Design a protein with these regions (language model features):
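Low-complexity acidic/polar repeat-biased segments
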Residues: 1-2, 175-219
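Acidic, glycine-rich calcium-binding repeat modules characteristic of RTX/beta-roll
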Residues: 3-5, 10-14, 19-174
Length: 219
């Protein structure tokens, strides 16, 4: 495993075709892990971290960072600051950490955890598991998203943002979505058409039907 070390200033670090350990340190850094299974630390500053090919682990650290796993089954940890996390391809794990973060799973069956702050979570394609954590979180769903599960939805605090006319359905209001729910044990399953579903864990269907605006927004 090769080791690359940045300095206190703004660095551009490029990994090899092997598995690299990259420590950017201070400054606003650009890092591309290249091939291999890389371990990347952005540390201080507002960093741009790209995993490249392979199953990579990226830590943003301090600052407002952008992390993109690219190919492979990657783990992304935002850390402090308002971070942007993109899993891209593969079955990825995304942790927002502190701050108001954007988490986008991309393709594959992903796990997204927002952490502290008001986060935006979009599982993307595949069957994803999402948890917003603390704060007022927004869960985004477009067509073709697969069968997703939200573990910690809180009515009146979090919101489900659904695309208008998702998958060709006649959906233009929260009331339209409330008519497409089913209670399955202690959970609610929302039918989003074309085989796509959204499962809300420990949620009551009667409350959704009585207060759809506390759950859904349509864009």
């Amino acid at each position: 495993m090769a080791t690359l070390e940045g300095g206190a200033y703004n660095d551009a670090l490029f990994g090899s075709r092997f598995s690299d350990f990259i420590h950017a340190h201070g400054g606003d850094d650009f890092v591309n892990g290249g091939n291999g299974h890389d371990l990347v630390f952005g540390d201080d500053g507002d960093d741009l971290l790209f995993g490249g090919k392979g199953n990579d682990t990226l830590f943003g650290g301090e600052g407002s960072d952008l992390l993109n796993g690219e190919d492979g089954h990657d783990t992304l940890v935002g850390g402090w600051g308002d971070d942007l996390l993109y899993g891209d391809k593969g079955n990825d794990i995304l942790f927002g950490g502190h701050g108001s973060d954007l988490l986008s799973g991309g393709k594959g069956n992903d796990i997204l955890y927002g952490g502290d702050g008001a986060d935006i979570l979009d599982g993307g394609k595949g069957n994803d598991v999402l948890a917003g954590g603390a704060g007022h979180d927004v869960f985004v769903f477009d067509g073709g998203g697969g069968n997703d599960v939200i573990l910690d939805f809180t009515a009146g605090e979090d919101v489900l943002q659904i695309s208008k006319g998702i998958n060709g359905l006649d959906v233009s209001s929260p009331d339209d979505l409330a008519s497409r729910i089913t209670q399955v044990g202690g959970n609610v399953v929302v039918d989003l058409g074309h085989g796509d579903t959204l499962t809300l864990v420990n949620v009551d269907a009667h409350d959704i039907q009585a207060n759809p605006d506390h759950y859904f927004t349509v864009h």
